[in-house]
């Protein structure tokens, strides 16, 4: 288990955002359809899930290629 104050980093394609992200949305929609489970989520959806699980200081730092993957950092409260 992650101790209080521990940090979690999520790096994956996320739904929504600038125009290049739409291609990523479509790609991962087909990917998850082929895998029969999962879906892309927006950074806001992921933030809400993290906060519900007790994480704080949720942030989304800028990445070099946001159309491929995004990053969310959170700290366990």
From Swiss-Prot:
GO biological process per UniProt: carotenoid biosynthetic process; chlorophyll biosynthetic process; methylation; photosynthesis
Keywords annotated in UniProt: Carotenoid biosynthesis, Chlorophyll biosynthesis, Methyltransferase, Photosynthesis, S-adenosyl-L-methionine, Transferase
GO molecular function: hydroxyneurosporene-O-methyltransferase activity; O-methyltransferase activity
Recorded metabolic or biological pathway in which this protein acts: Carotenoid biosynthesis; spheroidene biosynthesis
InterPro entries: COMT-like, O_MeTrfase_dom, SAM-dependent_MTases_sf
Entries under Gene3D superfamilies matching the protein: Vaccinia Virus protein VP39
Listed transmembrane segments: none
Enzyme Commission number(s) from the entry: 2.1.1.210
Changes seen on gene knockout: Cells accumulate demethylspheroidene as their major carotenoid during anaerobic growth and demethylspheroidenone when grown in the presence of oxygen.
Disulfide bonds: none
Record PROSITE patterns: SAM_OMT_II (PS51683)
Reaction(s) catalysed (UniProt annotation): demethylspheroidene + S-adenosyl-L-methionine = spheroidene + S-adenosyl-L-homocysteine + H(+)
Top enzyme category: transferase
Pfam families: Methyltransf_2 (PF00891)
Chain's role: Methyltransferase that mediates the O-methylation of 1-hydroxy carotenoids. Converts hydroxyneurosporene to methoxyneurosporene or demethylspheroidene to spheroidene. Also able to produce spirilloxanthin.
Similarity field: Belongs to the class I-like SAM-binding methyltransferase superfamily. Cation-independent O-methyltransferase family.
The protein's name: Demethylspheroidene O-methyltransferase
Gene name of the encoded protein: crtF
């Amino acid at each position: 288990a992650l101790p209080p104050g521990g940090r979690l980093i999520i790096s994956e394609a996320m739904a929504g955002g600038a125009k290049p992200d739409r291609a990523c949305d479509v790609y991962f929609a087909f990917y998850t359809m082929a895998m029969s489970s999962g879906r892309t989520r927006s950074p806001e959806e992921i933030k809400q899930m993290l906060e519900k699980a007790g994480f704080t200081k949720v942030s989304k730092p800028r990445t070099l290629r946001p159309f491929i993957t995004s990053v969310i950092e959170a700290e366990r409260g």
